[in-house]
Structures are given as structure tokens and as C-alpha cells.
């Protein structure tokens, strides 16, 4: 049952009730446009063998779904294909969207992108002007929308995610593995070289102070503080250089204007 507190990226039917049925569309295929789900009418229809029992057609396989005792729910599950079909309008400010893998999602009216949570789908769906589908009309795809970001392949887990920065050489956090990587290799290379240079300069300064102020330091012990500061700055810069030299790099798949 859809509610305001439900995560917009999660399917409306939990995995515990969905059985072992997998989506009909394989992952990472050419993305089809999503379609808006308008709840069909659920007036009582006399189905064969029953009288006056409310039923509805599944929006995926067109099988009849018995609504007896379920009219208080927002969505119902088909017993044939185990996919969700809405029977009520979504909560205020929300809308239904069906992924090409047939997973029914709920998101905000103003959302422009939504991710399918199914492990073997993980599509990033770009939402554009939605065509409302009536029960009498066949499902029609919505108009495709030009993405404004870049598809990036994570350097840690290899999954693809949408990066909204229009420039490369930035740090990105993968929504799948939650790890940080650099989009492009120019940024870590520049920073690694810069930190190595600064670190070596600080160490050379520390060595020069150590050699040049040995006699002076025997009388003024505060000179040791300047040695320590120079060596410490050099060590910190070299550690940062190691970090930037070892950071994983994520590469863009496609660029969009």
C-alpha cells in the first residue's frame, strides 16, 4: 500500500510478497520510456462463476484480479505475474510510474528521474511529459527526455549511475556502493603531482633548517619547533599525494550537451 513515507525508489510490493518472479526485461538494455499508471475503474463486474464480485484487469498480463476485501488498498498484486496494479489514485503530490521491467514505482509529481530498485534492472528512468493512459487505450510510451547529466561507470563496483555535473575531473559518490571516485583521471593526477611537489619542498626546507641551525638550536631550543613543522607539513602532503594517487577513477559512458 503506497504511503507518503515510502521510499520513492522502492517497489510498491515488497520482495516478501513478490515470489521468485523476475522482471520480464533484462538489465541494462536500451532504455524504454516509462509510462504513467492511471488507476483503472474498479466497479463491480460479474466474472464467470461469481456474481457481483469486484475484479480488475492486471495492467501487465491482463489477468483478472479479485478485489474482494482489497478495495482499501492503493495497489493490488496479480496472482499470475506477481506485478502490482494501482486501483486508487496515488497520494497527494505523488504519481505512479511503471518501469520497463514492469516494476510499479511511486515518486513525486515533480520528479524528473527515478531509479528502479530491482537488483537485475537498476535502470535510471528519465521522466518527461507523461501521457495518462485510460483503461480503454493501449499503453503508449511517454515522450523521451534528453538527459542533462552523464552516465558514469563506477570505478569500484562497475555499476552505471547518472552524474549531474556537466564537467569532468570532479569527485562523485556512487549510489550503489556509496564509495567516492574521481570522474576522469586528470584531477587526481594534478593533485597528486602538486602534493608531491609541496611535500618534497617542505622536507628539503626541514633538512636545510636542521643542517643550518644546529649550533643555533643548542642555545635556543625553540628552533626544534620549526624543524618539526617543516617535516610534519611535508609528511602530510606526501600522505595526501598517496591518497590522490590511489583513488579509483570512474569513466563516463556518454556525454550530453
From Swiss-Prot:
* The UniProt record lists the keyword Phosphoprotein: yes
So where does this one cross the membrane?
A: 192-212, 227-247
- Biased region (Basic and acidic residues) positions are 1-10
Spell out the Polar residues composition-biased ranges: 13-23
Q: Where is the active site?
A: 107
Tell me, in a sentence or two, what this protein's role is: Catalyzes the hydrolysis of phosphatidylinositol-4,5-bisphosphate (PtdIns-4,5-P2) to phosphatidylinositol-4-phosphate (PtdIns-4-P). Does not hydrolyze phosphatidylinositol 3,4,5-trisphosphate, phosphatidylinositol 3,4-bisphosphate, inositol 3,5-bisphosphate, inositol 3,4-bisphosphate, phosphatidylinositol 5-monophosphate, phosphatidylinositol 4-monophosphate and phosphatidylinositol 3-monophosphate. Negatively regulates the phagocytosis of large particles by reducing phagosomal phosphatidylinositol 4,5-bisphosphate accumulation during cup formation.
Keyword Cytoplasm among record annotations:
no
Q: Which GO terms describe its molecular function?
A: phosphatidylinositol-4,5-bisphosphate 4-phosphatase activity
Q: Which UniProt keywords apply?
A: Cell membrane, Cytoplasmic vesicle, Endosome, Hydrolase, Lipid metabolism, Lysosome, Membrane, Phosphoprotein, Transmembrane, Transmembrane helix
Species assigned in the record: Rattus norvegicus (Rat)
Residues folding into a coiled coil are none
Where on the chain is Phosphothreonine found, per UniProt?
22
List the taxonomic lineage: Eukaryota, Metazoa, Chordata, Craniata, Vertebrata
Q: For the motif CX5R motif, give the residue ranges.
A: 107-113
- Post-translational modification Phosphoserine, affected residues: 33
InterPro entries hit by this protein: PtdIns-P2-Ptase
Pfam families on file: Tmemb_55A (PF09788)
Leading EC class: hydrolase
Which parts of this chain are annotated as the region Disordered?
A: 1-43
Q: Which GO terms describe its cellular component?
A: late endosome membrane; lysosomal membrane; phagocytic vesicle membrane; plasma membrane
Protein EC: 3.1.3.78
> Could you tell me the Gene Ontology terms of the biological process aspect for this record?
negative regulation of phagocytosis; phosphatidylinositol dephosphorylation
What gene does the UniProt entry assign to this protein? Pip4p2
Q: What is this protein called?
A: Type 2 phosphatidylinositol 4,5-bisphosphate 4-phosphatase
Protein's membrane topology: Multi-pass membrane protein
Subcellular location(s) per record: Late endosome membrane; Lysosome membrane; Cytoplasmic vesicle, Phagosome membrane; Cell membrane
Q: Which reaction does this enzyme catalyse, per its entry?
A: a 1,2-diacyl-sn-glycero-3-phospho-(1D-myo-inositol-4,5-bisphosphate) + H2O = a 1,2-diacyl-sn-glycero-3-phospho-(1D-myo-inositol-5-phosphate) + phosphate
Amino acid at each position: 500500500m503506497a504511503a507518503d513515507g515510502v521510499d520513492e525508489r522502492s517497489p510498491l510490493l515488497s520482495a516478501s510478497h513478490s515470489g521468485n518472479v523476475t522482471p520480464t526485461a533484462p538489465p541494462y538494455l536500451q532504455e524504454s520510456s516509462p509510462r504513467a499508471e492511471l488507476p483503472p475503474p474498479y466497479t463491480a463486474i460479474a466474472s464467470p462463476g461469481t456474481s457481483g464480485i469486484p475484479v480488475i484487469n492486471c495492467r501487465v498480463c491482463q489477468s483478472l484480479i479479485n478485489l474482494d476485501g482489497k478495495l482499501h488498498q492503493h495497489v493490488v498484486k496479480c496472482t499470475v505475474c506477481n506485478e502490482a496494479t494501482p486501483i486508487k489514485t496515488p497520494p497527494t503530490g505523488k504519481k505512479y510510474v511503471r518501469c520497463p521491467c514492469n516494476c510499479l514505482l511511486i515518486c513525486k509529481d515533480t520528479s524528473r528521474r527515478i531509479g528502479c530498485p530491482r537488483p537485475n534492472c537498476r535502470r535510471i528512468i528519465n521522466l518527461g511529459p507523461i501521457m495518462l493512459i485510460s483503461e480503454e487505450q493501449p499503453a503508449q510510451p511517454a515522450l523521451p527526455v534528453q538527459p542533462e547529466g552523464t552516465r558514469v561507470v563506477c570505478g569500484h563496483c562497475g555499476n552505471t549511475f547518472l552524474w549531474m555535473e556537466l564537467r569532468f575531473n570532479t569527485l562523485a559518490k556512487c549510489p550503489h556502493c556509496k564509495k567516492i571516485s574521481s570522474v576522469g583521471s586528470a584531477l587526481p593526477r594534478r593533485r597528486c603531482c602538486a602534493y608531491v611537489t609541496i611535500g618534497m619542498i617542505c622536507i628539503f626546507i626541514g633538512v636545510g633548517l636542521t643542517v643550518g641551525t644546529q649550533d643555533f638550536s643548542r642555545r635556543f631550543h625553540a628552533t626544534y619547533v620549526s624543524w618539526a613543522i617543516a617535516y610534519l607539513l611535508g609528511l602530510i602532503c606526501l600522505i595526501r599525494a598517496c591518497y590522490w594517487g590511489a583513488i579509483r577513477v570512474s569513466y563516463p559512458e556518454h556525454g550530453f550537451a
